[in-house]
Amino acid sequence: MRRRFRAESGGNGLAVLVLLALISVQQLLPVGTGRYFGTVGDWYSQHTAAAETLRQAMLESGRLIPQYLPLGGGSSGYDFAYYGLLRPDVLLGCLFPSVEMKDLVAGYALLGIYASGVLCFFWLKTCRIPIWFSFAGAALLVSSSAFYQAHNQIMFVNYMPFLILALWGIGRVFERKSPALLAVAVFLIAVHSFYYLPACLCAAGIYTIHLFLRGGKGNLCGGGGSLCGREGKKEKLRAAAGIGAGVVMAVGMAMILLLPVGLDILSTGKDAGKFAEEAFTAADPGLSGLLYSPYSCGMTALSLYCLLTAFWQKGSRFLAGALLLGTGVPAVSLVLNGFLYAREKILIPFVPLLALLCAETLWKLYKGELKHRPMLLLLCLGAALVSEWKPLMLLDTALLGIWILVQKGAAGRNAALKRYSCLLCLCFPGMFALAVNGAEFWEAQLRDLGISISTVSYLEQEDSRQDWYGQLGRESIAFDRNYRMEVLTDGFVNSNLARQDMPSRTSMYSSVSNSGYGTFFYDTMKNPIAYNNRVALAAGENPCFACFMGIRYVITKEGQVPEGYTPMERWGEYVLSENPRVRPVCYGAYDLMSLESFEKLEFPETLLALCSRGVVRETGDTEKLYSPGFWQEDPETFFAGDGVEKLLSLHGKKESFGISLEEPLSGKVLILQFQVESQNKGAAVISVNGIKNKLSSEKAPYPNGNHTFTYVMDTGDNLKELWIEASKGNYRVENLKIWLAEESLLHQEEISIPEAEPTVWGKGELFLGNVDMEKDGYFITSYPWREGYEILADGEAVEGEAVNTAFLGFPLDKGEHQIEISFEAPGYTVGKWISAGSFGIFGVLLLWGAAGKYRTAGKNIRKEERVR
């Protein structure tokens, strides 16, 4: 017995070491040296940047869940819960504030993959699957191309270790053990990725039904134990109750996150992109939800063959059928995505179940309990012929056929060949995972084969686009926090970065955001849409928007300082500049315009009205007559020479050129607008004086639909030329319009600037100060309107309303007033108490269970003593 234990322990150790080595090769080899385990796309601009901002807010407020963040004009902390509001790597960052968040996020993601592989191996062993077949299942799991998301869209897979623990916990309940492991695991899934929680619970439910149908965990792979007969029914009820209690307890503990997030999502919109408009078939013969794609389960033909083979066995038919149904019927993806779209990324939580079924099937094929069915290869071949990965899948299916022939030929003759060929069949999945993670190196070759794969380069360690953040933290600059700051250099990459010791920002990039503010940002203020989607709100050089939102400070590189701003600090290649003529964030206003009058205005007068008036629901008899400030220019006389022809003759050739103006412009706001139509549904990018607009390709995941390019710019003192940069493509430019207005009109509004005290946004404290109203008017802010604000004027509660189409304000009488504005996310208090109660009950149950074990042990000892 002891020798067997040592042999098994040695086998476990060797299997784990080989598994860790496999993961290291697959994940780290493509990264190489001098680069991060993370990509230059969303990983850098969204995930790590949002994590850093959350860390700063937690440290300043002393709270695990910051109520309000200084992004997007002011956002609920729950707007960023999609990226994992309580992720352990963010919390760890609070303990080690000097460690860069990039290092923590990358390290935690790698640790999650290693943990997923090792936990899967030991979980499969608890299912009575032998060591090397448990290793095979774990190897297939970590070879899934879905783990490409660990350095791209981290929330797609960062819950995986805890999903495996949840499945393990379900098995423990069937063994009459506590559901505590299940409860903790489900809670951690919710903390890491609430979006994937329903899909994970679906996977757990499928596994539970599978165990019920098998007669309990003991019968999972032919072991003892049964849930049959009268006693079996009682055991089923007990197991169902235990599993249900564990899940309910976990959801209750996570309610401080889930309830406010749910209300936040319901209060705003979510861009489903082109996927919402895509028609889907009743079934997907290419099984794109199962095979190859890193935005699906990402398995190979071996998994499909094992699924089809297992379907022929009674004990595995339900699990195999459920997985085939889930990955082959797009309607399942639609439901799990909350009816938003039918994207296969939501199926990734099924990967551990696929690993289980593959490991069990390979073992039974090896033992001879299941027979190879070469005819099933025809089904794999059929899927290959209609798959977008056709060349790769044909090769994969051919190798699979060779393996089957070797297995059948070695049956009863060469046991070693049969055993080792089972391990060799893992080579293709392992090599495929390596290829996907390093696809940037051979993207051209894949495209030559007709395989379209989205590749993003790994982040170079010397990347300096966020260096301003650390440099600003080392400076002692007296900012007026009743104004805002923007980063105009590399706006996309920096859109989610904000320090608590600097003014708030108007930019943000989150899949969940205030839809009213997003509409105002692009549709009302006509900020340039420079990226593939409208989710990224990255401010550019728009003088009307800067004035309205109070962008007093901007960070740029040398030579990129906008008109109207004066440099005040320099460090390295960055310049901090100031424009004190913009509006503050909060102020008293008297020049009011009714919403009805505003809605009668047309662009661009709407810009001027917002910058010179306060737009409120009703004004009574106090409204002044609005005088238009913009006038329209004739393009033929506005440009000198053939300037109009040059601009309208852009047809997709990459070029850069200058267009001279007929007369120099000084002290003006210039608006240039034209239509762009793509002839082949491709992308088009046109920059005017460094302001970039983009029409994204219709193949982009979330096309921006930006067919009207608008450029709002300050002419400065002597604008003589416009510099045009156009991208290559097949598009045409038409319907050119030009408007001008005096820049001074942006600053003519009569306002009262309050005296504000420092506040901590993470605690929900937005404004505390005094304002002296010279007459009756409105206290207007540029905090985006949403539910959750609390306003006190002279200690009395005041009801806020939407002003300036999308912001918070309220009427205020003449005189001096003390104003206090705070924010608490709807559902936060209720969720907090539910979580506190659930944690309390969970703790009591754990103590009760421990005490019960202690009492049972004591009884057994006393019983043995009496026997003696």
Protein language model features and the residues they cover:
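Membrane-interface micro-motifs in multi-pass membrane enzymes
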Residues: 78-83, 102-115, 133, 140-164, ...
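Membrane-embedded helix bundles of polyisoprenyl
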Residues: 19-23, 110-127, 131-213, 242-262, ...
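Contiguous transmembrane helix-bundle modules in multi-pass membrane proteins
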Residues: 196, 319-464, 816-858, 867-868
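Active-site-proximal, structured, solvent-exposed surfaces of multi-pass membrane proteins
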Residues: 47-51, 627-868
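Extracytoplasmic/lumenal acceptor-recognition loop(s) of multi-pass membrane glycoenzymes
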Residues: 79-82, 429-460, 475-545, 583, ...
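Membrane-interface coil-to-helix junctions
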Residues: 21-117, 139-160, 265-270, 278-293, ...
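Periplasmic/ER-lumenal interhelical loops and adjacent helix-loop junctions
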Residues: 45, 52, 239-348, 463-470, ...
